Amino acid sequence: MARFSLYRQALTAYCIMFHIVLVEPEIPPNTGNIARLSLAAGARLHLVEPLGFEIDDRSLRRAGMDYWHEVDVHRWPSLESLQQHAVSEARWFYFTTKTQRPYWDTQFADGDYLVFGRETKGLPESLLQTHAERCLNIPMQPSARSLNLATSVGIALYEAKRQLAVGIRIPSNPDCAQTSSNS
């Protein structure tokens, strides 16, 4: 019975909503894979323009497979427009190779925005300087320039979910209330 209870707690925690923000993504298969990841993890995906591809691009749909119509995805003309529409209490974390603070030194919470830059350039330097206290790094060997964008998003998103899957909690997402009340 204890195993079932832990399993139920883990499932309930998977109803937590995080926001994945891709700023000017360039490579369709990366975005498609991240869309699929967002769906699987229950996260909302935000695409900040300009995009390096069309949403109906065949390789984007192929990477997202037949899931694309189910993905909670929103397009924004700029990061500023997204930030203006976001909940004012929301926390934003900016993933970059240009900081020493590892992602595991952060306590993630429901509703956090995990922000990632373009595959070739990352996030704008001005954005990183403005939000230096919220910049996070995924540590890697010095000989590696960077990780694949979809890999980075997966690492960050599932670390955030892992942190919130520990212990008993009531999800803030109303769609998940039925799951937690059936425990």
What are these language model-derived features?
Residues M1-S183:
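Post-transcriptional modification and biogenesis factors for structured RNAs
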